Amino acid sequence: MDIVVNPEETKKVKYTWAYPRFEYNMTYYQVYNNAGSGYFTLMENPSSFDISMTYRFLSGDGSTGYKADYTGMALAYREHLIDEGILTEKTESDGDIPMRVDFVMSDVKKSVVGTEQVVTTDVDGVREILEDLSAQGINNVNSGLIGWQKKAETLAKPYAYKFSSKIGRKGEFEELFTDFAAKGTDISYSRDFVTINKKMISFYTNAAKHVNTWYLMTDKSVLYPANCPIFETGYALPSKTAEWIRKLSGKVSDYSESFTITGASNILTSTYDRNGVVSSLTDAEELIRNAVAAAGENMKINLVNPNQYLWEYTDRYLQAPVGTSQYVFETDSVPFLQMVLHGTMEVYGPYSNFSFYTDSDILRMIDYNISPSFIFTKEPSYLLADTVSSDMYSTEYEQYRNLAKKVYDGVNSVLSQIRGYEWTGREVPESGVIVNTYVKNGAKAQVIINYTDSDVNCLGTVTKALSASVVK
C-alpha cells in the first residue's frame, strides 16, 4: 500500500489531501540469461487480497473527543489498536526507568587460512560491566548479546546453538543468565534471522527469490572493510525465518527470560519460483507472526524497530526512531510513534554511544518518553575494524562508563516521576519549549522540556536552559 499526498511541490494548490493506493499488479524486470539481459513485464497473476480501511475524523481543540492535530491522531490510533487487540495497556511499576545495554561479543574476519573469530567481550566481561553499572546505581537493566555463538553472527547458521570457549561455554552462559535474573537483570540472546550469506548457509533451499527467480542479493562491498569475509548478503525464505526463530527460542527458553530478534522484526519479503509466488507478503507476515507469538509464550520478546503486525507480541521496542526520514523538508519532528506505543511496551532509543548523548539528545529522550540504550564491548572497538561489525566504531565500555551514568541519570530524573502515567497531550507554547501532559488516577503531571539556551518561565516554574522539569 502507498500513501499518495497531493498537491505535489510544483503545484500551487491551497489544500492538501491524502489517500491510500493499493497495487494488485506491478511491472518487474524479467531476466532471461546469465548476463542479466531482460525486459519489463507485468506479473502473470495479480495479487489477491481484501482491502479494509478505518477512518477516524477529528475536529476541534480536544474539548470533545481527540484534538485535530498529531497528538489527537496518535491517541486515536492508539485507541484503535487497543480495541483491535494489537496493543494491550500494561501496568507500569513505580521506580527507575529501564536501560538497554547490548554487547558485541565477537565477529569474524579473514585470516591467513580461512577466518578468525575476534572476541571483544567474553562472559566474564559482560558480568563485570553489568556489575559495574549496578555499583553506579543503574539496576533496572536488560541486555542483548550479539555474536555470542561459535562463528559469530556473520557465519553461524541462524539456528545454531554452539558456543566458543574463547567467549564462554554453554554452562557459563546459563550461569550468567540465572545469576543476573536473580538480581532483576534480564539478559537475552540476540539473532538476525533474515540476513544470510553463502558462507553461512546454502542458498539453494534457504534463500528468497525475486519474481524474476533470481536470488534477492545486496552488494555491500562499499560498506564492508576489505578484510571482511563476506560482501554480499541475501534474504532468508520466510518459512525458514519462522522455523529458525522457533528452533533457537525453544533451545534457550529454559533459562532465558527474553529473546531478542533482529531482521525478522522489520524486514518482510515475498519469494517466488518458476511457477509463481511461493510466499506472498501476507503469507510471510503470518509465518513470522506465528513464530514470534510461539517464542513469546515462554519469554519476553525484544524486537528491533518492529513492523506493526508484530506489536501485539512486543515487550520491548528497540532502536525507536527519534528523527525525521529527511526525505522532505519538515518544520519539526514529533513523537507520534512513541505516543501510540506509550504504556503498552517498553520503548528504547538509538544507541547513545553513537552521537546521541548531548544535552539536547537527553532532552529528546525525555520529550519522546523513551529509555536510553547503549552497546558495549569490553575490548577496544578497533578489533572489529575488519568485520561486518566495523560500523560499531565506538563501543569500549571504559570510554563510556561515565557517560552512561550521566545519560541515564539525566533521563531517569524526570521520567521516573511519571512512571505509570498516561500520556494525554503535547503542546509547544513557544519555539524550543515543549509541555507534555500526563494523567494518573485524576492527577495531572506536566513535563516542561526547554531546548533553548535561555531559562524559561512556564506554568509558573522556571526551567533552566537545556533542561527539563516536572510540574504536578
Identify what each model region corresponds to.
Residues 143-145, 189, 261-264, 303:
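Conserved beta-strand positions
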Residues 92-179, 183-240:
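Aromatic-lined carbohydrate-binding/catalytic grooves of carbohydrate-active enzymes
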Residues 84-88, 140, 187, 372-373, ...:
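Short secondary-structure junctions and interdomain/linker hinges
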Residues 69-81, 122-132, 234-260:
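An active-site-proximal structural segment forming one wall of the substrate-binding cleft
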Residues 132-138, 173-187, 247-257, 290-301:
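A structural motif corresponding to the C-terminal end of an alpha-helix
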